[in-house]
A protein has these predicted regions:
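Single conserved hydrophobic/aromatic residue that forms the stacking wall/gate
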Residues: 1-6, 10
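C-terminal functional extensions of proteins
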Residues: 227, 236-237, 244-250, 256-319
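Short hydrophobic/aromatic-enriched beta-strand-loop microsegments
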Residues: 45-53, 83-93, 134-139, 173-182, ...
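Active-site glycine-rich loop that binds ribose-phosphate moieties when present
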Residues: 99-108, 127, 133-149, 156-162, ...
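Long, charge-dense
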Residues: 87-114, 177-186, 264-280
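Active-site cofactor/substrate anionic-group-binding motifs, chiefly glycine-
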Residues: 47-96
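N-terminal glycine-rich anion-binding loops that anchor highly charged ligand groups
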Residues: 27-36, 40-42
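N-terminal basic/disordered segments at the start of proteins
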Residues: 11-28, 314-317
Length: 319
């Protein structure tokens, strides 16, 4: 009999060839986010951060897009490609940022700040994007805010850490922040990060702007996942302490095999909090089943879709 390790490899190979075969048969492409499991990243036709994935979704020629990521990302693809079938293998894979900013509560919040331009991070539901003037990602939040006249007040949602970081860089005093945070980026420990830096004196600290201000303040580089990846290639450092979701380490190692990447520890060592639990729900099994059944599919009310499309397209125009 096959050993259990060998039978796992055999099962995995079977699954991979089934996914490839289903992709061909259904005319589907797979878009995946950097925070998904390494084996999911391996079956993707395109891998990126949320800005790159939004842009790529529009270019896809296939009639079916399977989105390996969390729910709001698949919604964004559907908003931009209404005539395509957008499949989401795990519709219950949500996001603490999106969940913490509910459409009705946001409507009330906006009503308290009339005359403010609404800038929403893409980590929100399509209903929030429909109430938004312009979306942003962590790649272009600074650019988006800078595109708005300095005297024009801004309502920024839902990530208070990203909002505060942009506020600091622009020196704006007229930004109101929704009080939301990412459960992964909120959990990193400053104490442990500084201790790790002492153990690795030559290492550079690279952090995501969703982290708390006391983390970004000590980082050598702060940027989106795509920006961090590029920076690690440009930098002369050979070691990096990575203060973002640990899924990115697979791509870092793949791109820069000679460099060393150390995941930053969360406050609570037992929780595995530097992994996005939702992203890791997307497995090869769920992808295969989703392709097979061409379901679950993302469905969005047309009026909501059109309103959301305006704010997303404005973001993409800004770049």
């Amino acid at each position: 009999a096959l050993s259990s390790a060998a039978s796992d490899v055999y099962k995995r190979q079977n699954l991979l060839s089934r996914i490839e075969e289903l992709k061909r048969r259904k005319g589907a492409v797979i878009l995946a986010h950097y925070y998904t499991l390494p084996e999911v990243q391996a079956v993707a036709d395109f891998l990126g951060d949320s800005l790159a994935l939004s842009i790529e979704a529009q270019k896809v020629e296939a009639r079916t897009i399977l989105f390996a990521g969390v729910h709001f990302m698949a919604e964004t693809a559907k908003v931009l490609c209404p005539d395509k079938k957008v499949l989401i293998p795990v519709p219950e894979a949500s996001c603490s940022l999106a969940d913490g900013c509910e459409a009705e509560a946001f409507r009330r919040f906006r009503a308290r700040y009339p005359g403010h331009t609404v800038v929403s991070y893409v980590n929100t539901s399509v209903e929030i994007k429909a109430q938004t003037d312009v979306c942003c990602t962590s790649s272009n939040a600074l650019k988006v805010v800078e595109s708005i006249p300095a005297e024009q007040p801004i309502l920024f949602a839902p990530d208070r850490n990203l909002g505060a970081y942009v506020q600091k860089l622009t020196g704006r005093t007229n930004m109101v922040l929704w009080d939301g945070a990412c459960h992964v980026h909120e959990e990193f420990s400053l104490e442990k990060l500084l201790a790790l830096r002492e153990e690795h004196p030559g290492a550079e600290v690279v952090a995501h702007p969703e982290c708390r201000a006391y983390i970004t303040a000590v980082a050598d580089f702060v940027g989106s996942t795509a920006a961090i990846l590029d920076y690690c290639g440009r930098s002369d450092a050979q070691e990096f302490i990575v203060v973002t979701e640990a899924g990115i380490l697979a791509e870092m190692q793949r791109r820069y095999p000679r460099k060393r990447f150390i995941p930053a520890p969360p406050d609570d060592d037992t929780c595995g909090c530097n992994n996005c639990f939702y992203m890791k729900m997307v497995t090869l099994e769920r992808i295969a089943a989703c392709l097979e059944n061409e379901s679950p599919e993302v469905v969005i009310d047309e009026q909501v879709r059109r309103a959301a499309e305006r704010s997303i397209r404005r973001m993409i125009e800004i770049g």
